[in-house]
From Swiss-Prot:
Induction: By zinc. CDD domains: SEST_like. Disulfide bonds join 73-103, 156-180, 236-294. It is an enzyme of class 3 (hydrolase). Pfam families: Lipase_GDSL_2 (PF13472). This is Esterase. PANTHER family: LIPASE 2, SGNH HYDROLASE-TYPE ESTERASE DOMAIN-CONTAINING PROTEIN. The keyword Secreted applies. The lineage of its organism: Bacteria, Bacillati, Actinomycetota, Actinomycetes, Kitasatosporales.
């Protein structure tokens, strides 16, 4: 892989080469011997998982590579890629996992650029470096950090603006958190969001192009994000069993529908990118409306300031609205179902 290919975004050459590779693969498939339709592959399927903290399943302990720089990815040993892989094996579908390079904090461009780890812990190579010519399946989520969802949450919460909580800055620290719904709905935040979504769309296109170039035979599966805020936001006015904080802490209730609209827009952008790029999409948003952060005992999302399973220097780290064990299992089932569907085509 050349450094130019790693670092150039929106590269037309990647798209042209991808199209050529796909066309060649189609011709070879047509010329090859007929196989049995709908049969799962007999051989292990070389697979690469990629993504951010929602693929790594930040918040679930223990984490992998705890004693190395990759420990700062907070990738759970039992993340949804691991659980989905086992579930498929129980059905006779074996994934040969070449790598799981999912890492908390990853932006879309970290697929082709190095990722700086927090606290000066080092840097990781581009996630695309895990791809091989024989990779047959790629699965993962990227987009939330590029959109700046942590900054959006900070814009809406005085608690999250405290220095010890959630890295990053609010979109506009001069605007009060209490008015964040107005800020994103009709204020300066509206244009900021439009610009962010334009970037997300372009970079998701680049991501899928790159997978097609570096792993030309790979099925590409883009996984959306589970729904955080329910349709009925009055549920968010009650703390979950055993909790004292509300699921979204001090975020105003009138801002919660705005946050949900932003997440729905991200989901739609990811779905469109997958469709336009000829990839498959796992619509977790559509399938998790009964398991949001505000669904009490049924919640699949840990509350914003609810203690997760992780500790840092003896202090519990909050979930920051990431999937808990239940949510991880929902992710794993829907991803495994999609992989089974794809491999049985």
């Amino acid at each position: 892989m050349s450094s130019a290919m790693r670092k150039t975004t929106n590269s037309p050459v990647v798209r042209r080469l991808t199209a050529a590779a796909v066309a060649l693969g189609s011709c070879l498939a047509l010329a090859g011997p007929a196989g049995s339709a709908g049969a799962a592959p007999a051989d292990p399927v070389p697979t690469v998982f990629f993504g951010d903290s929602y693929t790594a399943n930040f918040g679930i302990a223990p984490v992998t590579n705890q004693d190395s720089e990759r420990g700062w990815c907070f990738q759970a040993k039992e993340n949804y890629p691991a659980v989905a892989t086992r579930s498929l094996a129980d059905k006779g579908i074996t994934l040969d996992v070449q790598a799981d390079v999912s890492c908390g904090g990853a932006l879309i461009h970290h697929f082709w650029e190095k990722q700086e780890l927090p606290f000066g812990a080092g840097e990781l190579p581009p996630q695309q470096d895990a791809l091989k010519q024989d990779t047959q399946l790629t699965v993962g989520s990227l987009g939330g950090n590029t959109l700046g969802f942590n900054r959006i949450l900070k814009q809406c919460s005085d608690e999250l603006r405290k220095p010890s909580l959630l890295p990053g800055d609010p979109v506009d620290g001069d605007e009060p958190a209490a008015k964040c719904g107005e800020f994103f709905g009709t204020g300066d935040g509206k244009q900021w969001l439009d610009d962010q979504f334009e970037r997300v769309g372009a970079e998701l296109e680049e991501l899928l192009d790159r997978i097609g170039y570096f792993a030309p035979d790979a099925k590409r599966v883009l996984v959306g994000y589970p729904r955080l805020v329910p349709e009925d936001t009055t549920k968010c006015l009650t703390a979950a069993p055993g909790q004292t904080q509300l699921p979204f802490a001090d975020i105003p209730q009138d801002a919660l529908p705005v946050l949900d609209q932003i997440q729905k827009r991200l989901n739609d952008a990811m779905k469109k990118a997958a469709a336009d790029g000829g990839a498959d999409f796992v619509d977790l948003y559509a399938g998790t409306g009964a398991n949001t952060a505000c669904d009490g005992a049924d919640r699949g999302i840990g509350g914003l300031l609810e203690d997760s399973q992780l500790e840092l220097l003896g202090t519990k780290i909050p979930w920051y609205a990431h999937p808990n064990d239940k949510g991880r299992d929902i992710q794993a089932k829907q991803v495994a179902d999609k992989i089974e569907e794809i491999l049985n085509r």
